Protein backbone atom coordinates (compact mmCIF):
# COMPACT_ATOMS: atom_id res chain seq x y z
CA UNK A 1 0.00 0.00 0.00
CA UNK A 2 1.28 3.49 -0.83
CA UNK A 3 1.31 5.72 2.22
CA UNK A 4 -0.52 9.00 1.80
CA UNK A 5 -1.62 8.49 -1.80
CA UNK A 6 -5.43 8.61 -2.00
CA UNK A 7 -6.75 8.43 -5.53
CA UNK A 8 -7.54 11.45 -7.67
CA UNK A 9 -11.23 10.73 -7.24
CA UNK A 10 -10.94 10.95 -3.46
CA UNK A 11 -9.14 14.28 -3.43
CA UNK A 12 -11.48 15.78 -6.01
CA UNK A 13 -14.48 14.73 -3.94
CA UNK A 14 -13.16 17.04 -1.23
CA UNK A 15 -13.89 19.94 -3.58
CA UNK A 16 -17.61 19.62 -2.99
CA UNK A 17 -17.18 20.01 0.74
CA UNK A 18 -14.85 22.96 0.27
CA UNK A 19 -16.99 24.84 -2.25
CA UNK A 20 -18.87 27.12 0.21
CA UNK A 21 -15.66 27.99 2.03
CA UNK A 22 -13.98 28.81 -1.26
CA UNK A 23 -16.17 31.91 -1.47
CA UNK A 24 -14.51 33.35 1.60
CA UNK A 25 -11.60 35.78 1.41
CA UNK A 26 -9.28 33.50 3.38
CA UNK A 27 -8.25 29.98 2.45
CA UNK A 28 -10.24 27.23 4.19
CA UNK A 29 -8.60 25.14 6.87
CA UNK A 30 -7.02 21.99 5.49
CA UNK A 31 -5.37 19.04 7.15
CA UNK A 32 -1.89 17.87 6.22
CA UNK A 33 -3.35 14.62 4.89
CA UNK A 34 -5.83 16.46 2.66
CA UNK A 35 -3.13 18.80 1.41
CA UNK A 36 -0.84 15.89 0.62
CA UNK A 37 -3.56 14.12 -1.36
CA UNK A 38 -4.17 17.26 -3.41
CA UNK A 39 -0.43 17.77 -3.92
CA UNK A 40 -0.01 14.23 -5.28
CA UNK A 41 -2.90 14.80 -7.66
CA UNK A 42 -1.33 18.11 -8.70
CA UNK A 43 2.01 16.41 -9.31
CA UNK A 44 0.37 13.87 -11.62
CA UNK A 45 -1.68 16.59 -13.31
CA UNK A 46 1.33 18.77 -14.15
CA UNK A 47 3.72 15.96 -15.15
CA UNK A 48 3.00 16.11 -18.93
CA UNK A 49 3.24 19.91 -18.97
CA UNK A 50 6.71 19.94 -17.43
CA UNK A 51 7.84 17.04 -19.63
CA UNK A 52 6.75 18.88 -22.76
CA UNK A 53 8.37 22.14 -21.68
CA UNK A 54 11.78 20.58 -21.02
CA UNK A 55 11.57 18.59 -24.26
CA UNK A 56 10.68 21.76 -26.15
CA UNK A 57 13.62 23.67 -24.71
CA UNK A 58 16.08 20.92 -25.57
CA UNK A 59 14.72 20.34 -29.07
CA UNK A 60 14.58 24.02 -30.04
CA UNK A 61 17.84 25.17 -28.47
CA UNK A 62 19.80 24.16 -31.55
CA UNK A 63 20.71 25.30 -35.02
CA UNK A 64 18.86 23.61 -37.91
CA UNK A 65 20.52 20.54 -39.33
CA UNK A 66 22.81 19.95 -36.36
CA UNK A 67 20.89 17.03 -34.88
CA UNK A 68 17.86 14.87 -35.61
CA UNK A 69 14.67 16.36 -34.18
CA UNK A 70 16.43 19.53 -33.00
CA UNK A 71 16.01 22.97 -34.56
CA UNK A 72 14.42 26.40 -34.04
CA UNK A 73 10.72 26.82 -33.38
CA UNK A 74 8.40 27.34 -36.35
CA UNK A 75 10.55 25.21 -38.64
CA UNK A 76 10.31 21.59 -39.71
CA UNK A 77 13.26 19.42 -38.73
CA UNK A 78 13.27 16.45 -41.11
CA UNK A 79 14.94 13.17 -40.20
CA UNK A 80 16.38 11.93 -43.53
CA UNK A 81 17.00 8.26 -42.71
CA UNK A 82 16.36 5.45 -40.25
CA UNK A 83 18.51 5.38 -37.11
CA UNK A 84 21.72 3.34 -37.50
CA UNK A 85 22.26 0.11 -35.60
CA UNK A 86 24.25 1.81 -32.85
CA UNK A 87 21.85 4.74 -32.30
CA UNK A 88 20.71 5.01 -28.68
CA UNK A 89 19.27 8.50 -28.53
CA UNK A 90 15.66 7.27 -28.52
CA UNK A 91 14.17 4.01 -27.27
CA UNK A 92 11.94 1.93 -29.57
CA UNK A 93 12.97 3.71 -32.74
CA UNK A 94 10.60 3.65 -35.69
CA UNK A 95 11.66 1.91 -38.92
CA UNK A 96 8.40 2.48 -40.81
CA UNK A 97 8.38 6.23 -41.35
CA UNK A 98 10.72 9.20 -41.49
CA UNK A 99 9.98 11.93 -38.98
CA UNK A 100 9.35 15.63 -39.52
CA UNK A 101 9.21 17.47 -36.21
CA UNK A 102 8.15 21.06 -35.57
CA UNK A 103 7.57 23.06 -32.40
CA UNK A 104 5.12 25.89 -33.06
CA UNK A 105 5.35 29.22 -31.24
CA UNK A 106 2.10 31.17 -31.47
CA UNK A 107 2.73 33.61 -28.62
CA UNK A 108 2.76 36.47 -31.15
CA UNK A 109 0.53 35.26 -33.98
CA UNK A 110 -0.91 32.16 -35.66
CA UNK A 111 1.16 29.99 -37.97
CA UNK A 112 0.42 28.43 -41.34
CA UNK A 113 1.30 24.80 -42.05
CA UNK A 114 1.69 23.78 -45.68
CA UNK A 115 1.91 20.19 -46.87
CA UNK A 116 2.58 18.94 -50.42
CA UNK A 117 0.70 16.36 -52.43
CA UNK A 118 2.08 13.00 -51.23
CA UNK A 119 0.46 11.17 -54.16
CA UNK A 120 -1.46 8.76 -51.96
CA UNK A 121 1.43 8.07 -49.61
CA UNK A 122 0.59 7.74 -45.91
CA UNK A 123 1.61 10.74 -43.83
CA UNK A 124 0.57 11.97 -40.43
CA UNK A 125 0.85 15.38 -38.73
CA UNK A 126 -0.48 14.92 -35.17
CA UNK A 127 -0.53 18.17 -33.20
CA UNK A 128 0.01 17.92 -29.45
CA UNK A 129 -0.81 20.72 -27.04
CA UNK A 130 1.42 21.28 -24.03
CA UNK A 131 -0.70 18.87 -21.98
CA UNK A 132 0.12 16.13 -24.57
CA UNK A 133 -3.42 15.88 -25.97
CA UNK A 134 -3.64 15.41 -29.75
CA UNK A 135 -6.12 18.12 -30.73
CA UNK A 136 -5.74 17.73 -34.50
CA UNK A 137 -4.23 15.15 -36.81
CA UNK A 138 -4.02 16.25 -40.46
CA UNK A 139 -2.90 13.55 -42.83
CA UNK A 140 -3.79 10.49 -44.84
CA UNK A 141 -6.72 9.42 -42.62
CA UNK A 142 -8.39 12.78 -41.99
CA UNK A 143 -7.55 15.30 -44.72
CA UNK A 144 -6.27 13.09 -47.53
CA UNK A 145 -2.97 13.31 -49.38
CA UNK A 146 -3.51 16.30 -51.67
CA UNK A 147 -1.58 19.51 -50.99
CA UNK A 148 -3.11 21.44 -48.11
CA UNK A 149 -2.85 24.57 -45.99
CA UNK A 150 -3.72 24.76 -42.29
CA UNK A 151 -4.02 27.91 -40.20
CA UNK A 152 -3.19 27.05 -36.59
CA UNK A 153 -4.41 29.70 -34.13
CA UNK A 154 -3.55 30.20 -30.44
CA UNK A 155 -6.13 30.37 -27.64
CA UNK A 156 -8.34 33.45 -27.75
CA UNK A 157 -7.44 34.50 -31.27
CA UNK A 158 -10.02 36.41 -33.29
CA UNK A 159 -12.94 34.66 -35.00
CA UNK A 160 -12.53 32.87 -38.31
CA UNK A 161 -13.01 35.44 -41.06
CA UNK A 162 -12.13 33.27 -44.02
CA UNK A 163 -12.55 35.94 -46.69
CA UNK A 164 -10.47 38.43 -44.74
CA UNK A 165 -7.76 35.84 -44.22
CA UNK A 166 -7.65 35.10 -47.92
CA UNK A 167 -7.42 38.78 -48.85
CA UNK A 168 -5.15 40.12 -46.09
CA UNK A 169 -2.79 37.19 -45.69
CA UNK A 170 -3.09 35.60 -49.17
CA UNK A 171 -4.25 32.29 -47.76
CA UNK A 172 -5.70 29.75 -50.21
CA UNK A 173 -9.48 29.64 -50.23
CA UNK A 174 -9.51 26.06 -48.99
CA UNK A 175 -7.32 26.79 -45.95
CA UNK A 176 -8.48 24.85 -42.91
CA UNK A 177 -8.40 26.54 -39.50
CA UNK A 178 -7.23 24.58 -36.46
CA UNK A 179 -7.66 26.11 -32.99
CA UNK A 180 -4.83 25.15 -30.64
CA UNK A 181 -5.51 24.85 -26.88
CA UNK A 182 -2.02 26.19 -26.01
CA UNK A 183 0.30 28.71 -27.72
CA UNK A 184 3.08 26.13 -27.99
CA UNK A 185 2.37 23.00 -30.04
CA UNK A 186 4.46 20.00 -31.04
CA UNK A 187 3.93 18.41 -34.46
CA UNK A 188 5.45 14.93 -34.71
CA UNK A 189 5.08 14.30 -38.43
CA UNK A 190 5.62 10.90 -40.03
CA UNK A 191 5.86 9.89 -43.69
CA UNK A 192 5.67 6.23 -44.76
CA UNK A 193 9.03 4.95 -45.95
CA UNK A 194 9.53 1.57 -47.62
CA UNK A 195 13.15 1.06 -46.65
CA UNK A 196 16.35 2.96 -47.63
CA UNK A 197 15.63 2.73 -51.40
CA UNK A 198 12.60 4.94 -50.70
CA UNK A 199 14.54 7.73 -48.99
CA UNK A 200 14.85 10.06 -51.99
CA UNK A 201 11.10 10.06 -52.63
CA UNK A 202 10.29 10.71 -48.98
CA UNK A 203 12.89 13.47 -48.66
CA UNK A 204 11.25 15.37 -51.52
CA UNK A 205 7.93 15.15 -49.67
CA UNK A 206 9.56 16.29 -46.43
CA UNK A 207 11.02 19.31 -48.21
CA UNK A 208 7.44 20.38 -48.93
CA UNK A 209 6.44 20.55 -45.27
CA UNK A 210 6.51 24.25 -44.34
CA UNK A 211 5.77 26.43 -41.31
CA UNK A 212 5.26 30.18 -41.61
CA UNK A 213 4.09 32.87 -39.18
CA UNK A 214 0.79 34.20 -40.54
CA UNK A 215 2.20 37.68 -41.26
CA UNK A 216 4.99 36.15 -43.38
CA UNK A 217 2.93 33.65 -45.35
CA UNK A 218 3.49 33.95 -49.09
CA UNK A 219 6.55 36.14 -48.61
CA UNK A 220 10.23 35.37 -48.94
CA UNK A 221 11.22 33.57 -45.72
CA UNK A 222 13.36 35.59 -43.35
CA UNK A 223 16.70 34.16 -42.26
CA UNK A 224 16.37 32.13 -39.08
CA UNK A 225 18.19 33.65 -36.14
CA UNK A 226 19.12 31.11 -33.51
CA UNK A 227 20.24 32.23 -30.08
CA UNK A 228 21.58 29.29 -28.14
CA UNK A 229 20.69 29.45 -24.45
CA UNK A 230 23.64 28.02 -22.48
CA UNK A 231 21.47 27.66 -19.37
CA UNK A 232 19.40 24.88 -20.96
CA UNK A 233 20.50 21.42 -19.82
CA UNK A 234 20.99 19.67 -23.15
CA UNK A 235 22.51 16.48 -21.76
CA UNK A 236 20.10 15.25 -19.08
CA UNK A 237 17.02 13.50 -20.50
CA UNK A 238 13.74 15.38 -19.91
CA UNK A 239 12.34 12.47 -17.88
CA UNK A 240 15.33 12.53 -15.53
CA UNK A 241 15.07 16.30 -15.12
CA UNK A 242 11.39 16.11 -14.23
CA UNK A 243 11.72 13.08 -11.97
CA UNK A 244 14.50 14.65 -9.89
CA UNK A 245 12.84 18.03 -9.25
CA UNK A 246 12.05 18.96 -5.67
CA UNK A 247 8.45 19.82 -4.84
CA UNK A 248 9.28 23.51 -4.58
CA UNK A 249 10.96 23.67 -7.99
CA UNK A 250 8.35 21.44 -9.63
CA UNK A 251 5.29 23.39 -8.53
CA UNK A 252 6.94 26.79 -9.04
CA UNK A 253 7.77 25.85 -12.61
CA UNK A 254 4.29 24.43 -13.16
CA UNK A 255 2.71 27.67 -11.94
CA UNK A 256 4.74 29.71 -14.42
CA UNK A 257 3.79 27.41 -17.28
CA UNK A 258 0.14 27.63 -16.25
CA UNK A 259 0.28 31.38 -16.90
CA UNK A 260 1.00 30.70 -20.59
CA UNK A 261 -0.78 27.41 -21.20
CA UNK A 262 -4.38 27.42 -19.99
CA UNK A 263 -5.87 24.30 -18.43
CA UNK A 264 -8.55 22.43 -20.33
CA UNK A 265 -12.10 23.51 -19.59
CA UNK A 266 -12.86 20.18 -17.90
CA UNK A 267 -9.96 20.68 -15.46
CA UNK A 268 -11.90 23.07 -13.23
CA UNK A 269 -12.40 20.57 -10.36
CA UNK A 270 -8.68 19.94 -9.90
CA UNK A 271 -7.88 23.63 -10.45
CA UNK A 272 -10.25 24.46 -7.60
CA UNK A 273 -8.57 21.87 -5.41
CA UNK A 274 -5.07 23.15 -6.11
CA UNK A 275 -6.04 26.63 -4.96
CA UNK A 276 -6.38 25.13 -1.47
CA UNK A 277 -2.63 24.43 -1.43
CA UNK A 278 -1.59 27.74 -2.96
CA UNK A 279 -1.38 26.83 -6.66
CA UNK A 280 -3.56 29.11 -8.76
CA UNK A 281 -3.66 29.95 -12.50
CA UNK A 282 -2.04 33.27 -13.27
CA UNK A 283 -0.05 33.43 -10.05
CA UNK A 284 3.52 32.49 -9.16
CA UNK A 285 4.19 29.85 -6.52
CA UNK A 286 6.74 29.86 -3.70
CA UNK A 287 6.66 26.86 -1.39
CA UNK A 288 8.67 28.81 1.18
CA UNK A 289 5.75 31.18 1.74
CA UNK A 290 3.34 28.40 2.67
CA UNK A 291 2.32 27.40 6.16
CA UNK A 292 4.74 24.74 7.55
CA UNK A 293 1.92 22.19 7.49
CA UNK A 294 1.40 22.75 3.76
CA UNK A 295 5.14 22.66 3.13
CA UNK A 296 5.39 19.24 4.76
CA UNK A 297 2.39 18.04 2.78
CA UNK A 298 3.92 19.11 -0.53
CA UNK A 299 7.51 18.03 0.12
CA UNK A 300 6.88 14.33 -0.50
CA UNK A 301 4.37 14.76 -3.35
CA UNK A 302 6.94 14.04 -6.11
CA UNK A 303 8.05 10.74 -4.56
CA UNK A 304 4.51 9.60 -3.85
CA UNK A 305 3.28 10.79 -7.24
CA UNK A 306 5.91 8.66 -8.97
CA UNK A 307 5.04 5.68 -6.78
CA UNK A 308 1.41 6.05 -7.81
CA UNK A 309 2.38 6.16 -11.48
CA UNK A 310 4.61 3.09 -11.15
CA UNK A 311 1.88 1.21 -9.29
CA UNK A 312 -0.64 1.88 -12.08
CA UNK A 313 1.55 0.89 -15.04
CA UNK A 314 0.95 -2.91 -14.89
CA UNK A 315 -2.83 -2.46 -15.08
CA UNK A 316 -2.91 0.29 -17.67
CA UNK A 317 -3.46 -2.04 -20.64
CA UNK A 318 -5.14 -5.37 -21.31
CA UNK A 319 -2.88 -8.33 -22.13
CA UNK A 320 -3.96 -10.83 -24.80
CA UNK A 321 -1.83 -13.71 -26.14
CA UNK A 322 1.21 -12.18 -24.45
CA UNK A 323 0.64 -8.78 -26.11
CA UNK A 324 -0.10 -5.60 -24.17
CA UNK A 325 -2.92 -3.77 -25.95
CA UNK A 326 -3.43 -0.11 -25.06
CA UNK A 327 -6.06 1.57 -27.22
CA UNK A 328 -8.36 3.36 -24.76
CA UNK A 329 -7.98 7.10 -24.05
CA UNK A 330 -4.68 7.35 -25.90
CA UNK A 331 -3.77 10.71 -27.39
CA UNK A 332 -6.84 12.35 -25.83
CA UNK A 333 -7.05 11.69 -22.11
CA UNK A 334 -9.91 13.81 -20.80
CA UNK A 335 -9.65 13.84 -17.02
CA UNK A 336 -7.66 10.61 -16.82
CA UNK A 337 -4.64 12.52 -15.56
CA UNK A 338 -2.87 9.45 -14.21
CA UNK A 339 -2.76 7.73 -17.59
CA UNK A 340 -1.76 10.98 -19.29
CA UNK A 341 1.18 11.34 -16.90
CA UNK A 342 2.31 7.74 -17.33
CA UNK A 343 2.23 7.98 -21.12
CA UNK A 344 4.25 11.21 -20.93
CA UNK A 345 6.78 9.47 -18.72
CA UNK A 346 7.25 6.29 -20.75
CA UNK A 347 6.36 7.37 -24.30
CA UNK A 348 5.94 11.11 -24.78
CA UNK A 349 4.10 11.95 -27.99
CA UNK A 350 1.51 9.17 -28.27
CA UNK A 351 -0.77 9.16 -31.32
CA UNK A 352 -4.52 8.82 -31.52
CA UNK A 353 -5.38 5.11 -31.74
CA UNK A 354 -7.30 5.80 -34.96
CA UNK A 355 -3.95 6.76 -36.51
CA UNK A 356 -1.74 4.05 -35.01
CA UNK A 357 -1.67 1.48 -32.21
CA UNK A 358 1.36 -0.29 -30.77
CA UNK A 359 0.86 -3.77 -29.30
CA UNK A 360 3.86 -4.64 -27.13
CA UNK A 361 4.89 -8.26 -26.64
CA UNK A 362 5.50 -9.24 -23.02
CA UNK A 363 5.82 -13.03 -23.26
CA UNK A 364 5.75 -16.06 -25.55
CA UNK A 365 3.02 -18.70 -25.65
CA UNK A 366 4.44 -20.31 -22.49
CA UNK A 367 4.30 -17.06 -20.54
CA UNK A 368 8.06 -16.52 -20.55
CA UNK A 369 9.95 -13.43 -21.82
CA UNK A 370 11.60 -13.69 -25.22
CA UNK A 371 15.25 -14.75 -25.32
CA UNK A 372 17.61 -15.23 -28.25
CA UNK A 373 18.67 -18.59 -26.88
CA UNK A 374 15.35 -19.83 -28.25
CA UNK A 375 13.66 -19.74 -31.65
CA UNK A 376 10.24 -18.16 -32.12
CA UNK A 377 7.60 -17.67 -34.77
CA UNK A 378 4.39 -15.73 -35.14
CA UNK A 379 1.86 -17.02 -37.67
CA UNK A 380 -0.87 -15.01 -39.34
CA UNK A 381 -3.41 -17.33 -40.89
CA UNK A 382 -4.60 -16.60 -44.42
CA UNK A 383 -6.73 -13.47 -44.35
CA UNK A 384 -5.84 -12.77 -40.70
CA UNK A 385 -2.91 -10.38 -41.03
CA UNK A 386 -3.08 -7.29 -38.81
CA UNK A 387 -6.25 -5.44 -39.93
CA UNK A 388 -5.16 -2.03 -41.19
CA UNK A 389 -6.22 0.55 -43.71
CA UNK A 390 -2.60 1.64 -44.18
CA UNK A 391 0.20 -0.78 -43.19
CA UNK A 392 1.69 -2.74 -40.28
CA UNK A 393 5.09 -3.78 -38.97
CA UNK A 394 6.90 -5.67 -36.21
CA UNK A 395 10.11 -4.22 -34.76
CA UNK A 396 12.59 -6.10 -32.57
CA UNK A 397 14.48 -4.44 -29.70
CA UNK A 398 16.93 -5.58 -27.06
CA UNK A 399 15.94 -5.56 -23.39
CA UNK A 400 16.75 -1.84 -23.17
CA UNK A 401 14.54 -0.90 -26.12
CA UNK A 402 17.26 -0.44 -28.75
CA UNK A 403 17.59 -1.98 -32.22
CA UNK A 404 19.97 -4.90 -32.60
CA UNK A 405 22.74 -4.90 -35.21
CA UNK A 406 22.60 -7.93 -37.51
CA UNK A 407 23.97 -9.21 -40.85
CA UNK A 408 20.83 -8.19 -42.74
CA UNK A 409 20.77 -4.70 -41.19
CA UNK A 410 17.07 -5.43 -40.69
CA UNK A 411 15.36 -4.09 -37.58
CA UNK A 412 11.72 -4.53 -38.56
CA UNK A 413 9.49 -6.45 -40.92
CA UNK A 414 6.65 -4.60 -42.60
CA UNK A 415 3.66 -5.37 -44.77
CA UNK A 416 5.32 -3.72 -47.79
CA UNK A 417 8.09 -6.34 -47.81
CA UNK A 418 8.09 -9.30 -50.25
CA UNK A 419 7.28 -12.01 -47.71
CA UNK A 420 7.24 -15.68 -48.62
CA UNK A 421 3.86 -17.19 -47.71
CA UNK A 422 3.18 -20.82 -46.86
CA UNK A 423 1.28 -23.02 -49.37
CA UNK A 424 -1.92 -22.56 -47.35
CA UNK A 425 -1.62 -18.77 -47.59
CA UNK A 426 -0.50 -18.20 -44.01
CA UNK A 427 2.43 -15.95 -43.14
CA UNK A 428 5.10 -17.07 -40.68
CA UNK A 429 7.66 -14.62 -39.24
CA UNK A 430 10.84 -15.95 -37.58
CA UNK A 431 12.54 -14.37 -34.55
CA UNK A 432 15.86 -16.02 -33.77
CA UNK A 433 19.58 -15.35 -33.58
CA UNK A 434 20.69 -17.60 -36.44
CA UNK A 435 19.30 -17.74 -39.96
CA UNK A 436 16.27 -20.04 -40.36
CA UNK A 437 17.63 -20.97 -43.79
CA UNK A 438 18.12 -19.10 -47.03
CA UNK A 439 14.61 -19.97 -48.20
CA UNK A 440 13.10 -18.35 -45.07
CA UNK A 441 15.27 -15.26 -44.66
CA UNK A 442 12.68 -13.04 -46.34
CA UNK A 443 10.56 -13.63 -43.23
CA UNK A 444 13.39 -13.47 -40.68
CA UNK A 445 13.84 -10.76 -38.07
CA UNK A 446 17.26 -11.38 -36.48
CA UNK A 447 17.37 -11.48 -32.68
CA UNK A 448 20.27 -10.98 -30.26
CA UNK A 449 21.63 -13.87 -28.23
CA UNK A 450 20.03 -12.52 -25.07
CA UNK A 451 16.71 -11.01 -24.02
CA UNK A 452 14.63 -9.08 -26.54
CA UNK A 453 11.08 -7.86 -27.11
CA UNK A 454 8.77 -6.92 -29.96
CA UNK A 455 6.57 -3.97 -30.84
CA UNK A 456 3.86 -4.32 -33.46
CA UNK A 457 2.67 -1.15 -35.19
CA UNK A 458 -0.69 -0.87 -36.93
CA UNK A 459 -1.11 2.33 -38.96
CA UNK A 460 -4.68 3.23 -39.76
CA UNK A 461 -5.98 0.26 -37.73
CA UNK A 462 -9.40 -1.06 -38.63
CA UNK A 463 -12.28 -1.13 -36.15
CA UNK A 464 -11.70 -4.73 -35.13
CA UNK A 465 -8.19 -3.86 -33.94
CA UNK A 466 -9.42 -0.85 -31.98
CA UNK A 467 -12.27 -2.68 -30.27
CA UNK A 468 -10.36 -5.85 -29.40
CA UNK A 469 -12.24 -8.10 -31.79
CA UNK A 470 -8.84 -8.81 -33.38
CA UNK A 471 -5.73 -9.41 -31.31
CA UNK A 472 -2.20 -10.41 -32.33
CA UNK A 473 -1.58 -14.17 -32.28
CA UNK A 474 0.88 -15.50 -29.70
CA UNK A 475 4.60 -15.67 -30.31
CA UNK A 476 5.32 -19.41 -30.36
CA UNK A 477 8.53 -20.79 -28.93
CA UNK A 478 9.97 -23.69 -30.93
CA UNK A 479 10.21 -26.97 -29.06
CA UNK A 480 13.76 -28.25 -28.68
CA UNK A 481 14.51 -31.95 -28.86
CA UNK A 482 16.60 -33.18 -25.97
CA UNK A 483 18.56 -36.36 -26.58
CA UNK A 484 18.45 -39.14 -23.94
CA UNK A 485 21.76 -40.31 -22.57
CA UNK A 486 22.29 -44.06 -22.18
CA UNK A 487 22.09 -45.00 -18.54
Regions found by a protein language model. Give the residues of each.
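Bacterial N-terminal signal peptides that target proteins for export
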Residues: 1-10
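General helical structural elements
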Residues: 7, 17-18, 461
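C-terminal segment of classical bacterial N-terminal signal peptides
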Residues: 14-23
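A compositional/structural signature for long, glycine/proline-rich flexible linkers
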Residues: 24-487
Amino acid sequence: MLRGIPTLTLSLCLAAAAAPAALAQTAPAITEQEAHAIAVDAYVYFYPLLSMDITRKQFTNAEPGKDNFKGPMNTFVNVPEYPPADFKGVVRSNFDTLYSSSWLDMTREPVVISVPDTNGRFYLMPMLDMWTDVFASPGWRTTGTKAGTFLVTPPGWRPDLRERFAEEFRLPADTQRIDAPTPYVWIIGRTKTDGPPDYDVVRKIQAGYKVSPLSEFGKTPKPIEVKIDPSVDMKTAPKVQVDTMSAGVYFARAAELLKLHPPHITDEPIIAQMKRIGIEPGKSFDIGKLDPVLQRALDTAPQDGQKLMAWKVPTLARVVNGWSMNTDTMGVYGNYYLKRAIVAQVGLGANLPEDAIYPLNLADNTGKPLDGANKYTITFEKGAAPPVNAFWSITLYDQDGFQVGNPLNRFAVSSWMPFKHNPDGSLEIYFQNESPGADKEANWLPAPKGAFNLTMRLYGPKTEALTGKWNPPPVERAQTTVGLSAQ
